[in-house]
Amino acid sequence: MRSRPAFLHDFYGATPGTSEFEVAKWLNRRVGSKNGEHFIRSSTIEAFVEEVREAGITAAVVVGRDTPNLTISNDRILEVTSPHPELIGIASVDPQKSNALAEIERAVNQLGLAGINIEPGFGNPPLSADDPSLYPIYDVCDQLQIPVFLMSGPTTPDLDYARPEAVGKVARLFPNLPIVCYHGFYPYVNEIIGVAFRYENVYLVPDMYIFLPGGRLYVEAANGFLRDQLLFGSSYPFRAMGQTVEDFLNLGFQEHVLDNVLFKNAERLLKLNL
């Protein structure tokens, strides 16, 4: 449910010898990658797609980014994904830009991208997910019947803007809007699981953080009430796809839950016909 090939930007390890490349290696080590430089392989879209196929992944979500410090345009996401049926594009908007609402409608209605990613905690100024200025973003996504993806995790500059209770407030105000929480709002695992328990329109993608201390709580919840709301994600390039699939299968998910978290939940959420 979440990947970005390295060639998209230096931040994802596009250029060896840069400080960004070293940061990508560092993060890979922190989340348990066996090969901290595996992402070098995705220097082209063809190599990235080959890795997706080798990992046995039927469909991989490729997400843009639009923050004050890093932008990958939605047109670029379309260019990368459209030739490859196994790649699903998710648009991104900076909600503080004046054209944010128009860009959402363009990305969905003209480009055909499958959802909208926002990262309010990375904004200038940073915002909580429940900041009223974001309500028009949620409203237009609700009207377009597409999911909104919230990215928040330990790398959020200030974790005060990554509190799960803010997601709960949005879920209550927009009960028909699917809200997908990238990085599973780690490290606030108990809290976000509690929010997802209360609001069935909240989905969790813990991706690489499911392998860190406390991450087994996601598995425990998915073996119970969360089986329709948890989704697999690789967080590539910060974790290798093949290793992540293998490690994920060994986390202790019950057999009847695996189809949901690996495939069916994403298919339903993104209205795919795979």
Task: Give the positions of each predicted feature.
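Catalytic pocket-lining loop regions of alpha/beta-barrel enzymes
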Residues: A114-G115, L127-L231
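Conserved, mostly hydrophobic/aromatic
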Residues: V52, I77, A107, I116, ...
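Mid-to-C-terminal alpha-helical segments outside catalytic/metal-binding sites
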Residues: R4-A55, A59, L226-Q229, R239-L274
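Active-site gating/metal-coordination segments in enzymes
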Residues: T58-A59, T67-L150, T155-T156, R198
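Structural motif corresponding to alpha-helix initiation and N-cap regions
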Residues: S42-E46, T71-N74, K97-L101, D131, ...
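Generic structural signal for well-ordered alpha-helices
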Residues: I45-V49, N74-T81, I104-E105, L134, ...
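Residue-level marker for beta-strand->alpha-helix junctions and adjacent short loops that shape enzyme
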Residues: T67, Q96, G123, T155, ...
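Conserved residues at the C-terminal ends of beta-strands
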Residues: V63, E119, K264
